[in-house]
Amino acid sequence: MGSHLDGSGTAKLQTLEHAVTLVQKLNTIVERMAQSQRMLQPLAQYRQQIQRAAAPIASLLKPQFEPISVMVTNLVIVSTRGGSDQQKVRSMRESVAQIKAALDATASRVRKEHTVADSDEKES
């Protein structure tokens, strides 16, 4: 006896997988920003890159996974906030880690909630 995902579960997982790819790009920008901060270079150029990378993630996740979308929006707010660059980079790294963890947890939950046994579908 096997099992598979129902239609809505498959669609949700595709959305989450696409979001994970986009978050990896966002993580790359944050890590480049951290490297520049360590080398005492200006970080102004990264703010716009972060906003451009985060906007598609937030809009992708908003319809089905709004809490994660809010986390992405908060990351953008942190990137525009004043204060020390070191604290900003630290907060952004934490935000990216929280987003990744939330995406993983949500993917596991979707798999659990939308798994259908093959025998159930054959009887219908």
Q: PLM ranges: what are they?
A:
Residues 2-33, 85-124:
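Amphipathic, coiled-coil-like alpha-helical segments
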Residues 20, 24, 48-51, 66-69, ...:
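Non-catalytic, well-ordered alpha-helical scaffold segments
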Residues 29-67:
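Amphipathic alpha-helical interaction modules
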Residues 39-43, 81-88:
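Conserved catalytic segment of histidine kinase HATPase_c domains, centered on the N-box/ATP-lid region
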Residues 55-58, 78-83:
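Short, glycine/alanine-rich amphipathic alpha-helical segment
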Residues 60-77, 91-94:
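Short, well-ordered alpha-helical segments
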Residues 72-81, 100-104:
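Long amphipathic alpha-helical coiled-coil segments
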